[in-house]
Amino acid sequence: IVRHRWPLFAAMSVLAIALGAGVSQIDLDDRFGEYLDNRYEFRRDTDFVAAHLTGLDSIEHALPAGGPGRVADVEYLRALDGLGDWYRAQPGVVYVASLAEMSKRLNQARHGEDPDFYRLPEIGAAALLGEYAAAAPADVARALVDESFSTSRLGVIVGDHSSRQLRHLAAGADAWLASNAPQYAAPATGLALMYAHVSGRNIEAMLISTAAALVLISALLIFALRSPFLGLLSLLPNLAPAVIALGLWGWLVGDLGLAVGDS
């Protein structure tokens, strides 16, 4: 080994660089539904629901109409309809529920289920919604509107989305509202979105803490060896195994998120 140290050093350097380049392939993201593996019944059940029934994640908007009874305004319903259409055009969106959709269905039902009337009513929307609220059970009638009819809920069910994709989808919806209906804008919310933001902040904190640890280790080595050159040089053999391992993970797997063990 000593006799052939330079060829070995060159070969190991090339191998380390090639494997370490896989770090660039790592996607720092995760999926809440994949925190547990298939040994757990919860994971098997959620996989079945996602594959055969519906999505597991949802995004909600509580959109103010500007005052009591204003949810029946045509302009407001058009804004809801536009936001719903934007969501449906996004990949992975399974279902959108809003007062605009209910109004179109009620308008169609009023006209004998004629498909041509599956549209927002130009007039009489308030009376239409009032009839529905009076006839439907209280919990059903309040599923999309509040008691004063001043705010309505728009709900979105999405399929297999990662935390980053959920954040991106919600940010796009907020941007659409800010551009097209700022008077009715309300930020996207929801339990899935909350976990998506927690995931993003955890990843940011992990990267910052790793960089801070590297700086502190470098400073300690420089102080211990009393040489900036030797201190920085000594980082190479200490960091190389970690970089190679992460690079190999990047080439073979690609995703790096939260890992959950049996403990």
Task: Show the residue positions of the predicted features.
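Extracytoplasmic
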Residues: 1, 5-263
